[in-house]
């Protein structure tokens, strides 16, 4: 949810490939029970980059593994409520392929919440940025424009938040100054290298910390809003 995007790139799928990675799901809760904050109240849709991140800033370790991002029941409920609120998801090939089993694998619907998540994810409009894919499935389409144009189109088509992931695509959007919020699920582990959550930047990007939350003794949620030049 993948690591955080979604349900940690989503570890719930990784469970199939790495049985020790996670145990799925959980308690039916509504959006209020999941504790989603509606603040700040933007007057437009915003672009969000959300992932689970190690203490030293990585979304996957040096072997490409991210089983350590496996969510608790409480955290998965929060992720599920978040995805319900999205208007679209922009993703790269790897994240798209990681999440595709939610649309194609009937065994992921074995539980009530598994089926619920599969329905929510399948219905979510997705734009896939890839130089190698010739086609995509379900409610997804291949991007036929630049990242900037794709983001503008997605934001213009909804009044809900739009999420972007994995790291390469998000890095391009950050470099273009397009990401409005960073939502980090900080996992208490140091992995020493791997895929960084954030790219190198050539100029400082000022942020406001607008929300924090803890999930048990393991995860800290950090929500940052980019400070725009015209902010007070």
Q: For each predicted feature, which ranges?
A:
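Enzymes that bind and transform nitrogen-containing heteroaromatic metabolites
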Residues: 1-232
């Amino acid at each position: 949810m993948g690591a955080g995007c979604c349900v940690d790139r989503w570890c719930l799928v990784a469970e199939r490939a790495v049985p020790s990675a996670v145990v799925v799901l959980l308690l039916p809760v509504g959006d209020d029970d999941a504790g989603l904050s509606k603040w700040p109240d933007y007057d437009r849709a915003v672009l969000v980059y959300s992932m689970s991140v190690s203490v030293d800033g990585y979304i996957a370790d040096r072997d490409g593994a991210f089983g350590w991002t496996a969510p608790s029941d409480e955290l998965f409920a929060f992720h599920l409520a978040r995805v319900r609120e999205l208007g679209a998801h922009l993703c790269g090939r790897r994240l798209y392929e990681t999440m595709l089993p939610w649309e194609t694998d009937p065994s992921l619907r074995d539980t009530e919440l598994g089926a619920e998540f599969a329905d929510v994810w399948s219905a979510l409009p997705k734009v896939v940025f890839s130089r190698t894919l010739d086609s995509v499935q379900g409610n997804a389409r291949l991007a036929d424009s630049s990242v900037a144009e794709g983001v503008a189109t997605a934001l213009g088509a909804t009044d809900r938040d739009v999420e972007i992931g994995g790291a390469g695509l998000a890095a391009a959007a950050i470099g273009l100054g397009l990401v409005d919020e960073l939502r980090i699920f900080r996992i208490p582990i140091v992995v020493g290298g791997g895929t960084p959550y954030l790219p190198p930047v050539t100029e400082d990007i000022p942020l406001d910390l607008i929300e924090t939350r803890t999930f048990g003794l393991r995860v800290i949620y950090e929500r940052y809003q980019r400070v725009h030049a015209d902010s007070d």
